[in-house]
């Protein structure tokens, strides 16, 4: 037999298209020729494969070896094709039986000693192999994450010799156990935050509906603390969501088996580039928005971000996916993240503070806020002020109910005074959030923030008084059609938290109150 055909997987976004690895031996000058649009690391496989076979005591053929990776128009990258290429050469030379090869798919990078090294995207490849009904042989270091896929037949291979022994029937490869005992960490709790009842209420609404949220306030008022506690308010990921998020992390090479059931939380620095935020590169990799899939993306110091970087968020905030186009290829990554952002009210940060330390002129304040475009702000569902706390509130035991102290001129919140109610834990708020999300899922099969225009008409109906109030707000605040729909979705979430089937006037009024930037 001078021809052998095996199968492996490439990566294209989060998809893992099947690749046929065809090996042909012929006369001519000895050497290995790899065709089928291989990248540099794939072309280098000929040297790794030769050394690995020889060190594993196999004979490398003194003939011309042609390796074709099909389909030819799909780029192949990384060392994942080392193992199938080596097995194809061994099968074509009759050193291993070929009758079992069609049942399996193979992926793995070979060390020069014949040991197998981990590969990226094992979880995505295992999902695709299960869908096509094939068993998958992977390096032992990657098989654990692939075994998380329910009903997938995955084998953990430590070396080329072990794979050959398995195919010859002399020894069986191990079936790795999935990491099903992973539990969610509870490292932060909402009760850690003193006061800020209004901001906590907005955080609960955002968690219940999957809404985007913007905190604005002076430095040190707890904006970042509140954002960090949003994941603790969200219900646990179901298995499908966890696998989707884990597959993205696996493709990026950041998969951690112990935490695969946790909600992702990403907080990139404001100096991050557009490629770091949304993904890209010559070999497209997922960015921060995809690594936050089914989780939380926190952008601190929002006006300090490059405006061009922020503008790329507009598409994924609406669609939940990001399309990356390059001259040679196109990739698509999921990006159903929940955006939480924070900013100061002005360039110096002290506008509205009780100390009166702000000396920014109106023009300077306007220039600072204009760093964030109107279309991006229009896509943020809730905007809430996080005012400074008094020393009394900070020194008191954890308190959540507060009353606002306002100045006599503009009604700007300057500080908060503590009341007497105990602070709620994340678990208590999460229980209400879970119930509200269950109501939304039973009604429409998705969170309220993901409702499309036709679904808003069906599920966010208002009575006459509610329609009148929203119409007045639209006229007075110059709300766009998008803002109108987002206010409706927030009102639907508030009604779900209250346990109401219908949206009432108080729900609409509260939702309008969170359109703060529409009033500036």
Give short role names for the model-derived ranges.
Residues 1-214, 218-221, 325, 484, ...:
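Peripheral, non-AAA+ core regions of ATP-driven protein-machinery
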Residues 215-257:
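Walker A/P-loop
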Residues 217, 279, 301:
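The Walker A (P-loop) glycine that initiates the GxxxxGKT/S ATP-binding motif of P-loop NTPases
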Residues 294, 300-301, 312:
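Walker B catalytic acidic pair
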Residues 112, 297-298, 304-305, 391:
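Residues immediately C-terminal
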Residues 19-25, 277, 381-384:
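Short beta-strand elements
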Residues 35-46, 59-61, 68-78, 284, ...:
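Basic, amphipathic alpha-helical bundle interface domains used for macromolecular binding and assembly
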Residues 204, 259, 264, 274-297, ...:
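Conserved alpha-helical scaffold flanking the Walker A/P-loop in AAA+ ATPase domains
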